[in-house]
């Protein structure tokens, strides 16, 4: 026999898939049925306690902020160009415009697994990896050039980190306009893009980035919206995907079906004409970062 609150969910939500997603979120897994009843009840009690810390107006304001965020990140279609998924079919793969020949690729935070970098190298692009958390490049290829440095904004730079401007200088890339940037630096991206100049950001023909900390209940959310607006002045989003590893963390705050890390693919706005993207997200190009949980449905803009 299921606990009483499970039977209530089943009665109120007739859609089987949606019902299962709610259960997954509440219990932070897909195999919740085999857990002990006491563990399930303890987790549900924890969720209720978190939710009680907010009132209805808090959630109205929070979802209003999420609405602002989605408006800033509204994706557009590039007229005359189609997206493709590059890299892994799971976490580590991204939807972007297929790069033409002769591009330069920057990979900030290569990590222990960077399938997109290897694909880019195999297609003939020169890939410059920067990651101070690993000893060497995860893959060996003559087109991959590894640097054991983390990335920082100028105001936070240290002898062991590199700024975007310093990398341009080191590699002789000042003025280059054919650079594709892939960046996933676990929150440090905000200071980098807050301080980057318009001249520097325009050197990137595509930016594939994971923005972290996009919960309206997190401190600094309004600052992050301002930085996203700054990026949108020169770069247009063409693809949006939410990392579903944030399910449990946001569910504990009462934000069901939400994640606070967004994977966004941008192109330089000057390079294309655009039209509204009428697709429902996630699309066929997407895959859940955590395959054990369903992807987060955004829908249509």
Region annotations inferred by a language model:
Residues 111-115, 180-192:
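Short acidic, Gly/Ser-rich segments with clustered Asp/Glu that frequently serve as metal-coordination loops
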Residues 191-214, 218-228:
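A short alpha/beta connector and helix-capping loop motif
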Residues 108, 130, 181-183, 209:
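Active-site flanking residues adjacent to catalytic metal/cofactor-binding acidic residues
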Residues 134, 153, 185-189, 213:
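Short, glycine/acidic-enriched loop or turn micro-motifs at the edges of active sites
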Residues 31-99, 112-113, 158-177, 213-301:
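Rossmann-like AdoMet/SAM-dependent catalytic core
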Residues 101-103, 125, 175-179, 203:
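Short coil/turn segments at beta-strand junctions that form active-site/ligand-binding loops
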Residues 81-159:
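SAM cofactor-binding core of SAM-dependent methyltransferases
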Residues 1-47:
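Boundary detector for helix-to-coil junctions that initiate low-complexity/charged tails
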